[in-house]
Amino acid sequence: GMSLFFNGVIFASTLNYGAIVGIDTLGIPNATYAVVLMASSLAGAAASVILGWLSDRVRDRRLLVVACALTGAIGFGAIYLIRDQLSFILVTCAVMPFAFAIFSQIMAHARVHLTAAQPGRADFMISALRTVFAVAWAIVPPFVGILAASTSVFEIYAVAAAAFLVIAAIYLVMLWTDRAAWTAGKAGGARAAPVRPT
């Protein structure tokens, strides 16, 4: 649930400011910005296909969530730190399409997990998770608006990069916990195995 809330933080804090940063702050011409958005949309479609193909082949979908989260942290971190037209265009067109696929990856993992663990309540729980995502859209924009007005509009990218890192941390902890439990279970099974007489 927390991962979807922070996913909502990412979208709610940045999507409304793309044109402000690109056109008003960095001075990208309107026509160029339109091309950037078109290229980003096409790259997003390609990223969805690639990640969909990978999700059927990786051992654990959570690895893709971590990869998307770290990609997003690097991309938005670059915009925040470099603050020029080239970095904004490259990140928007080539990096963020893969990072923004994190929502579908989180939902796919949640559906698989909930269907296996609580098949009777899976649909309800998925709806609840979508509500958590929507809550961020309701409460985050005023705060990032105040932040952008009182400091710099680039600060919103620092917020989004931090949210990506939080998601990566959540899923890395989940992976580590499952790995530790599996290792402990394997060790316990080895200790409980009967000794064959010779």
Where are these regions (language model features)?
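Residue-level signature of mid-helix packing/kink "hotspots" within the transmembrane helices
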Residues: 41-49, 137-138
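Cytoplasmic membrane-interface "Motif A"-like loop-to-helix N-cap segments
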Residues: 57-69
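Hydrophobic core of transmembrane alpha-helices in multi-pass small-molecule transporters
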Residues: 5, 86-103
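Helix-loop boundary and gating motifs at the non-cytosolic
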Residues: 1-41
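Helix-to-loop junctions at the C-terminal end of transmembrane segments
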Residues: 46-60, 148
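C-terminal ends and interior cores of transmembrane alpha-helices
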Residues: 70-84
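Symmetry-related core transmembrane helices of the 12-TM Major Facilitator Superfamily/SLC fold
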Residues: 155-173
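Cytoplasmic helix-loop-helix junction between adjacent transmembrane helices
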Residues: 96-131
